[in-house]
Amino acid sequence: MDLDEVYKKVHCEPQNPTLDPDKNYEVVEAKDGVDFDLEAAKKSLESAKKGTDVSIPLTYTPADMSTEEYRKMLFRDEMSSYSTEVEGSENRKTNVKLAAQYCDGTILMPGESFSYNLGVGELTEERGFLPGPSYADGQSVMDMGGGICQVSSTMYMACLYANLEIDERHCHPYPSSYVPAGLDATVAWGGCDFVFTNDTDYPIKISTSYDGYSTSCTIWGTITEPFSVELYTETVETEPYETKYELDKSLGKDEQVLDTVGIEGLTVQSYRRVYDGDGNVISDNPEAISVYSKRDEVYKVGKLPKDKDKDKDKDQNKDKSDSSDTDKKTTESESDTQEE
C-alpha cells in the first residue's frame, strides 16, 4: 500500500462555507479538515504482521464557521444606502430605470471588483435604452443612454459610505445637480468607468432601484466591526465664467434671449473620514480631486453689444453735429443782424 497516495486523497484543510458564483451563488457547505500522522502510519504498517489490519487514527479539524452561521451572516447588514431625485425627460428616466435594473442584485465575493460599464452593459436600443441628455467634448448633446451617470454617481456615494475601495472614478465636465460637487461619477461605454472592489471579508450585494421619483443604491454585507463614514469636500480653485453674446437676426435689435446658462469652473478635493463604533477617527484621507470646466453664459441678441455701442456713438456724434450746426446758424444770424 502506498501511504503517500492515501495521504494525498485523505488529507484536506478545513474549509469555511462560501458561495459558488458558477452555481447561482449557492452556499458551499463547510468541511472539516482531515489529517493523520503519515510517518507514524508508515511505521505501524512496516511493523505489522502480514495479513493483519492496521488502524490509522484520523484527526478532524472543524471549519472556523459552520454553514448555519454563515447563512445567518450573509448580507445581514445594510452597510450603506444613498438616494438621489431623478428629474428630466421621460427618456432620461427610462435610462435610469434600466441601469438600476441591470445592476440590481449583483453579488461580489471578497476581493472581487465591479465595473459599472460591464454591469449595465452596452447602451443600445435593442436593450431598451433611449437617447437622453449627455456631455460630449464639454457640450450638451443627446446620446444613447443619457442619464445613466446618475445611477453610477448614486452608487459611488453608497460605496463611499460603505467604506469600500474605489478603483476608478471620473467627474463630469460640469458639477451635477443630484450630488454635491466632487462626489459624482461619470461613465461612458468604451471610455471612462466606475469601478470598486469588495475589500471586506464577506460577500456583498448591490441593490439598485428606481421608483419613478428617485434612484437608490444599497450595499448589503456583513459588518464585523461597527463604523461610520463622513464625506466632506474643499473647493481648491474657482474660475468665473464670462458672458458672451451671439447674433441672432431673428430677434429685434433690443431683444436678447439666454441661450446657455453660465457655470463656474471648480477644482474640488473630496475626503473620506472613517469612525469606529465609539466615534473615534480611524482614518481621514483625501478621496479624489475633481476638475470641472467653466461654461460661459451665452445670450442670443438681435444686435451685438459692440454694434449697439457703435450706433450709440453715431447717435452721439450726430447729436453733436446737429448741435454744432445750430450754433453756427445762430451765430450767422446774429452776425447778419449786427451788419444790418
Question: Residue ranges of each PLM-predicted region?
Answer:
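Well-ordered beta-sheet/strand-loop patches within structured domains
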Residues: 1-340
